[in-house]
Amino acid sequence: MSRPLVFVTGNAKKLEEVVTILGNNFPAKLVSQSVDLPELQGEIEDICKKKCLEAAKIVQGPVLVEDTCLCFNALGGLPGPYIKWFLEKLGPEGLSKLLTGWEDKTATAICTIAYSSGDQNEDVILFQGQTTGKIVEPRGTRIFGWDPCFLPDGYDQTYAEMPKSEKNKISHRTKAVEKLRTYFTEKLNF
């Protein structure tokens, strides 16, 4: 790939996390670009594919688009892909209070990364990672979205309480990025 791979995001924290997880041996040059994409509704896979194709048209080249869901089991998967708006209106405290009337506090964090070569005739490829856990009252720093209220299974710290290095070993984003890295190193010629 002679052109750089554009990671479409305006979220500096997300970019920093992805670059850290990819490490120095990723075979493509990753650059970020903020692109005004439509906010779509639907299933996460469909949203990612459509956003990725639109981003590839705008950038006129290879792109990555990432979308994150936080699915509460008690609410049938909501907020799901709409977590951004729930978080903007409610904050981490409000997210945890959404489950006040339910015994089931379990949730799944899902990261879906979509890749397009830039060719509109080629399929978009998806890489998805999931981490299960539960929603708790916010603990830890408030610098990265809903991290303060997500407690991954098997841990006694929320994402926000963990050192970045620990979170980056187990997170939903890490699982998706590792699948992306494998695809790029094994399937594509760089």
From Swiss-Prot:
The keyword Hydrolase applies. It is an enzyme of class 3 (hydrolase). It catalyses: ITP + H2O = IMP + diphosphate + H(+); dITP + H2O = dIMP + diphosphate + H(+); XTP + H2O = XMP + diphosphate + H(+). Its cofactor is Mg(2+); Mn(2+). It holds the Pfam family Ham1p_like. Keywords: Cytoplasm, Hydrolase, Magnesium, Manganese, Metal-binding, Nucleotide metabolism, Nucleotide-binding. GO terms for cellular component: cytoplasm. The keyword Secreted does not apply. Transmembrane segments: none annotated. One of its GO terms (biological process) is nucleotide metabolic process. ITP binds at residues 9-14, 51, 67-68, 84, 144-147, 167, 172-173. Its main location: cytoplasm. Its EC number is 3.6.1.66. It comes from the Eukaryota. It is found in: Cytoplasm. PANTHER family: INOSINE TRIPHOSPHATE PYROPHOSPHATASE, INOSINE TRIPHOSPHATE PYROPHOSPHATASE/HAM1 PROTEIN. Homodimer. Pyrophosphatase that hydrolyzes non-canonical purine nucleotides such as inosine triphosphate (ITP), deoxyinosine triphosphate (dITP) or xanthosine 5'-triphosphate (XTP) to their respective monophosphate derivatives. The enzyme does not distinguish between the deoxy- and ribose forms. Probably excludes non-canonical purines from RNA and DNA precursor pools, thus preventing their incorporation into RNA and DNA and avoiding chromosomal lesions. Belongs to the HAM1 NTPase family. This is Inosine triphosphate pyrophosphatase. The lineage of its organism: Eukaryota, Metazoa, Ecdysozoa, Arthropoda, Hexapoda.
